[in-house]
């Protein structure tokens, strides 16, 4: 049976569904920032950006951009009622101090035990860029990761052990890919959802670590 991968927007929309009311959430640079566009207006979620924003909203409409309002990825945002601005140092104190309920990060690799690599591939021509990812990986109460299931070369991004430099150890709680959702639990990598038409056997073939099928029943 054939299957269709989720688009980046569909991944973001799916993550938005799992963010509880009243949560304080940091959205990492890249795909995670799209989540802001899929949070319902009547759902109180307080989005944090490491450059010193709290309670920002989705991107503005074309022509309504304010150059003073950008997130850590230099993308335009809007501010919600009650939103606030603060010093970069205060922002990192929030990140490191356990004040964020969830952070959503991208990834180069995720290991079976929840180790995360998302700042450097080790390639000689690559420019390392850790930003606040290490602070978020250890400081947030839960870490969600959004990523393609495999690289452009078809190599698994979910692996038995990291081969890239680690961002954080045993920090990932849930993985959202274009093929499935995986919970990282003491027993291993538990697949709780997968795209329609994708067999568990095919998903396992595309994954570099052993999976547990929890999609039945």
Curated annotation (Swiss-Prot):
Pathway: Aromatic compound metabolism; beta-ketoadipate pathway; acetyl-CoA and succinyl-CoA from 3-oxoadipate: step 1/2. Pfam families: CoA_trans. PROSITE patterns: COA_TRANSF_2. The active site is at 50. Transmembrane segments: none annotated. Belongs to the 3-oxoacid CoA-transferase subunit B family. PANTHER family: ACETATE COA-TRANSFERASE SUBUNIT ALPHA (PTHR13707:SF60), KETOACID-COENZYME A TRANSFERASE (PTHR13707). Heterodimer. This is 3-oxoadipate CoA-transferase subunit B. It comes from Acinetobacter baylyi (strain ATCC 33305 / BD413 / ADP1). The lineage of its organism: Bacteria, Pseudomonadati, Pseudomonadota, Gammaproteobacteria, Moraxellales.
């Amino acid at each position: 049976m054939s299957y269709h991968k989720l688009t980046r927007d569909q991944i973001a929309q799916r993550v938005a569904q799992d963010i509880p009311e009243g949560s304080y959430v940091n959205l990492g640079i890249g795909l995670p920032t799209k989540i802001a566009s899929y949070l319902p207006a009547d759902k109180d979620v307080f989005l944090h950006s490491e450059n010193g924003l709290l309670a920002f909203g989705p991107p503005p409409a074309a022509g309504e951009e304010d150059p003073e309002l950008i997130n850590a990825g230099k993308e335009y945002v809007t501010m919600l009622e009650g939103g606030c601005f603060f010093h970069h140092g205060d922002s990192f104190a929030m990140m490191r101090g356990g004040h964020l309920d969830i952070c959503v990060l991208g990834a180069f690799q995720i290991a079976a035990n929840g180790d995360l690599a998302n700042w450097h591939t080790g390639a000689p021509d690559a420019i390392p860029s850790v930003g606040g990812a290490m602070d978020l990986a250890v400081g947030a109460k839960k870490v969600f990761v959004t990523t393609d299931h495999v690289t452009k070369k078809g190599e698994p991004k979910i692996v038995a052990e990291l081969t890239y430099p680690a961002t954080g150890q045993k920090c990932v709680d849930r993985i959202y890919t274009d093929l499935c959702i995986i919970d990282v639990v003491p027993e291993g990598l538990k697949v709780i959802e997968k795209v329609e038409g994708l067999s568990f056997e095919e998903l396992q073939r595309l994954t570099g670590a052993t999976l547990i099928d929890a999609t039945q029943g």
